[in-house]
Amino acid sequence: MKILIDFFPILLFFGAYKAYDIYIGTGVLMAATLIQMGLIYTLDRKLTVMHKITLALILVFGTLTLVLHDERFIKWKPTVLYAAMAIGLALAVWVWKKNFLKLLLGSQMELPDPVWMRLNMVWVVYCVFMSLINAYVAAYYSTEAWVNFKLWGYAFPLVFIVAQGFYISRYLKTDEPKA
């Protein structure tokens, strides 16, 4: 159910774009994201900071796209989101000496501090990469190619997270008694 809720807006955006155009797709994306956040809030009784930032960016860039009738705004939303994540994760470590990943996930798993630091840096690099690749596709390819990239590009985070799972599993402490 959670995966369906996560992919609900992008699937509707893709369908609306294919059936109509980028502007109808953008309106559908905005409405679907509002519904998505309502569902998440109803189920979890909270929205994470990431949910709030994503919602704000979709509404701001979507509104600019629709009001100015300029598709470049919605195409740049992922670039801005990933760049903001990279900057936030990097500044947290280098300026405030805080590891946001550890703060967010530390209660769910116990890992050595160097592992948390490597994970944080890998996320910074990943977010920079995703920001740059989206900027490149948005700037140099057609809108149709960008929309297809957005839909099929969801494989990038899935592969990235699975790879992290394998990396993390080596460091997770188990409660099993040693023989």
UniProtKB/Swiss-Prot annotation:
Belongs to the YciB family. The keyword Protease does not apply. This is Inner membrane-spanning protein YciB. Keywords: Cell inner membrane, Cell membrane, Membrane, Transmembrane, Transmembrane helix. It is a multi-pass membrane protein. It holds the Pfam family IspA. InterPro entries: YciB (IPR006008). GO terms for cellular component: plasma membrane. It is found in: Cell inner membrane.
